[in-house]
Regions:
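A glycine-rich phosphate-binding loop feature that marks nucleotide/adenosyl-phosphate handling sites
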Residues: 2-9, 35-37, 56-63, 109-122, ...
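Catalytic or ion-translocation cores adjacent to nucleophile or general acid/base/metal-coordination motifs
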Residues: 15-42, 228-233, 322-341
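Glycine- and acidic
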Residues: 21-26, 74-81, 152-167, 189-199, ...
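Function-dense linear segments that define catalytic or interfacial modules
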Residues: 98-198, 203, 208-218, 317-344, ...
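Internal maturation/activation junctions in enzymes
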Residues: 172-195, 199, 203, 221-308, ...
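Acidic, low-complexity intrinsically disordered tails
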Residues: 452-481
Length: 481
């Protein structure tokens, strides 16, 4: 359920998933998300007041964003229509406390989601999906649908030269785009509004899996400048290939029905809607933009990096865009449980001649960390877990790739010892970077861990599995692609 923070039900909404309190006011199986206008973040930042309204009295607010929303909101404040006025910081703290306790609500920013959308000519987008990567227009006559696929990035790394094959990635992105168009045409639609939406706007969502594995294969630490630059080039290549193929499909079959009036119809692509990046574009975008203006595109939306919680296990990749959470752990999904061991680490430790029971027990004892092993510093950097790196790294990389992501991305954030101050800083930074999804889940580590009574391999592995499974509650497999 998505709600905007001006809604008079917001305070009760924040309590729905809490562990304590009135059971009649709890709904812990409901996934909660905020659809946040920039005005709220500005009021929090400046220490201002925040007004709550009944949706019955302010029926146009859900339809507005940007300056139009601000003008209407402030007019309703002056007219005295607020049901309650409070310090914006008070509501903000309530949101943060809920995230400390439950990992939710998800944080999505209404203005960037609309202002940076190729569907902005259709109307106002009012929500995302369960995994926060789909941002599509929907109304009473149309149910937004997306057609997903993920690309296994490690397949494009040459194991001998440790070079990345960008041209091959462009070619595969074109193939995926072509195939997803066939899915749209041949799919079974359970409802007419779903079929109507999919056929009119033809959105697709291309994501990735194994980004962390790709960095490792190329001898890069996740939090290195080289990895950040690679991330930018990878997503530029995927976006280029998908735009190119969507244009070629439009040549054959015609542009999607609502293409005219979209940003793309005017030669405006996703990266044109963002602030300039520190990294230059490397592909021939000018010529492609002219082709798009001439021939159109077959799809309104193209990229949407999703969680890949289950499908990444098929090829043994780390999921989606995330760092490794541990070098040895149990991954629990709705489809079952998977013991995950970092295969790249084992290979390197074997080559150094130090992979043995003692090393394995040391990794288990340190909850999947290698920072206390006697190994070269470059290996310690390369095999850092997400708990051992700044979350600014994840946000920066999300913003860099966001310039090529025309929907949004499932961006989890991780804090070993969360508090409201740290979370507030992360949210403010993500918002200022222009992200559409500021946070999917806030992942934390359990306070209690299995006591390591023994270094016996079997016993300690079971203990580690039990401890690590606490960190990986049931994952959503709907967006596995």
């Amino acid at each position: 359920v998505y709600i905007e923070p001006w809604n008079s039900d917001i305070e009760a909404f924040m309590d729905l998933r809490l562990n304590q309190g009135d059971e009649e006011a709890r709904c812990r199986d409901l996934f909660s998300a905020l659809w946040i206008p920039d005005l709220f973040m500005e009021r929090v930042q400046e220490g201002g007041k925040w007004s709550l309204f009944s949706p019955d009295d302010t029926k146009d607010l859900p339809e507005l964003y940007g300056d139009a929303f601000k003008e209407a909101y402030e007019r309703y404040e002056k007219e005295g229509k607020a049901t309650k006025t409070m310090d914006a910081h008070v509501l903000w703290q309530r949101i943060l406390r809920s995230q400390v306790e439950t990992g939710t609500p998800y944080m999505l920013y209404k203005d960037p989601c609309n202002e940076k959308s190729n569907q902005k000519n259709l109307g106002t987008i009012k929500c995302s999906n369960l995994c926060t990567e789909i941002v599509e227009y929907t109304d009473k006559d149309e149910t937004a649908v997306c057609n997903l696929a993920s690309i296994a990035l490690p397949k494009f790394v040459n194991p001998k030269t440790k070079k990345f094959n960008y041209q091959s990635l462009i070619d595969v992105s074109r193939t995926v785009t072509r195939n997803l168009n066939k899915v749209i045409d041949r799919n079974f639609y359970p409802t007419e509004p779903a079929r109507k939406s999919n056929m009119r706007h033809r959105p697709i969502g291309i994501g990735v899996q194994g980004l962390a594995d790709t960095y490792i294969l190329m001898d890069m630490a996740f939090d290195s400048e080289e990895a950040r630059a690679l991330n930018h080039k990878i997503f530029e290549a995927i976006y280029y290939g998908s735009v190119l193929e969507s244009m070629e499909e439009a040549k054959k079959y015609g542009a999607y029905e609502t293409f005219e009036g979209s940003p793309a119809s005017k030669g405006i692509l996703q990266f044109d809607m963002w602030e300039p990046s520190k990294y230059p574009l490397t592909l021939n975008w000018d010529a492609l933009k002219e082709d798009v203006k001439t021939h159109g595109m077959r799809n309104s939306l193209l990229l949407a990096p999703m969680p890949t919680a289950s499908t990444s296990q098929i090829l043994g990749n780390n999921e989606c865009i995330e760092p490794y959470t541990s070098n040895m752990y149990l991954r629990r999904t709705l489809a079952g449980e998977f013991v995950v061991i970092n295969k790249h680490l084992i290979k390197e430790l074997i080559s150094l001649g130090i992979w043995n029971n003692e090393t394995k027990n040391a990794i288990i004892r340190d909850n999947g960390s290698v920072q206390n092993l006697v190994i070269p510093d470059e290996l310690k950097a390369k095999y850092k877990t997400v708990w051992e790196m700044s979350q600014k790294v994840l946000i920066d990389q999300a913003a860099d790739r966001g310039r090529f992501v025309c929907q949004s991305q499932s961006l989890n954030l991780f804090l070993e010892d969360p508090n409201t101050s740290k979370i507030s800083s992360m949210h403010m930074y993500a918002w200022k970077q222009g992200l559409k999804t500021g946070m999917y889940y806030l992942r934390t580590r359990p306070k209690a861990r299995a006591v390591q009574f023994t270094v016996d391999p079997a016993t300690s592995l079971e203990a580690a599995k039990a401890a690590c499974s606490l960190e990986n509650k049931d994952e959503c497999t709907m967006c596995s692609a």
